[in-house]
């Protein structure tokens, strides 16, 4: 079971994601991205083995409220999982580029190829997933491992040492056929090195 602070980037998918996580027994608290980063860091410090999850949302990562500041201040200090806009924010935070994907997707099912490692272990390959995006990450820096792609576009990244990962697609969507398992394996991967104490306290 994980204690998850879910940052809501003002997106209806946030609540689908929260429902999926809660149905698997995780504790989830939701805060919108207009809350000051310091307030959320203080809230995370009260949680037992916290995980920060960054939701999908409209627009570009740099304009998503406190999300860029949270990544700057918390990367490497606790596990962070980003979805869609959250994934793009992770790419930017590590020095990558986020630009137009060349098409606007809203509920498009695509079969992505993945490396079969870590959170993708044992999953169907190619894996059918749901894509809702017009932007995509590129020029991925050396610190991030590209662990899934579709037609040359980056669909997932991870940073093993910092316990940070991002998915361009939506694991919580019914169109992502093994999304619930992927989320569970991602949380297990993210928490693998956590000690019983909270390093933010």
Swiss-Prot record:
Keyword Amino-acid biosynthesis: yes
UniProt protein name: Anthranilate synthase component II
Transferase keyword on record: yes
Misc note: Component I catalyzes the formation of anthranilate using ammonia rather than glutamine, whereas component II provides glutamine amidotransferase activity. In E.coli and certain other bacteria, component II is larger and its C-terminal two thirds has anthranilate phosphoribosyltransferase activity.
Biological processes annotated in GO: L-tryptophan biosynthetic process; phenazine biosynthetic process
EC number: 4.1.3.27, 2.4.2.18
Any one annotated GO CC term: cytosol
Subunit comment: Tetramer of two components I and two components II.
InterPro entries: Anth_synth/Amidotransfase, Class_I_gatase-like, GATASE, TrpG/PapA_dom
Occurrences of domain Glutamine amidotransferase type-1 (ranges): 3-196
Source species, domain of life: Bacteria
């Amino acid at each position: 079971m994980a204690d998850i602070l879910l940052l809501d980037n003002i997106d209806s998918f946030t609540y689908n994601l929260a429902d999926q996580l809660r149905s698997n027994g995780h504790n989830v608290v939701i805060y919108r991205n207009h809350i000051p980063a310091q307030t959320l860091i203080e809230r995370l410090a009260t949680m037992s083995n916290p995980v920060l999850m960054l939701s999908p949302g409209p627009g570009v990562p740099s304009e998503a409220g406190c999300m860029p500041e949270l990544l700057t201040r918390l990367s490497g200090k606790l596990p962070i999982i980003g979805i869609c806009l959250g994934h793009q924010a992770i790419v930017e935070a590590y020095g990558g580029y986020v630009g137009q994907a060349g098409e606007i997707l809203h509920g498009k099912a695509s079969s992505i190829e993945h490396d079969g490692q870590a959170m993708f272990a044992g999953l169907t390959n190619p894996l059918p997933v749901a894509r809702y995006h017009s932007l995509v990450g590129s020029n991925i820096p050396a610190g991030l491992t590209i662990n899934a792609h579709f037609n040359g576009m980056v669909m997932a990244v991870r940073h093993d040492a910092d316990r940070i990962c991002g998915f361009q697609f939506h694991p919580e969507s019914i169109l992502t056929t093994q999304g619930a398992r992927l989320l569970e394996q991602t949380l297990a991967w993210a928490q693998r090195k956590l000690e019983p104490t909270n390093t933010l306290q």
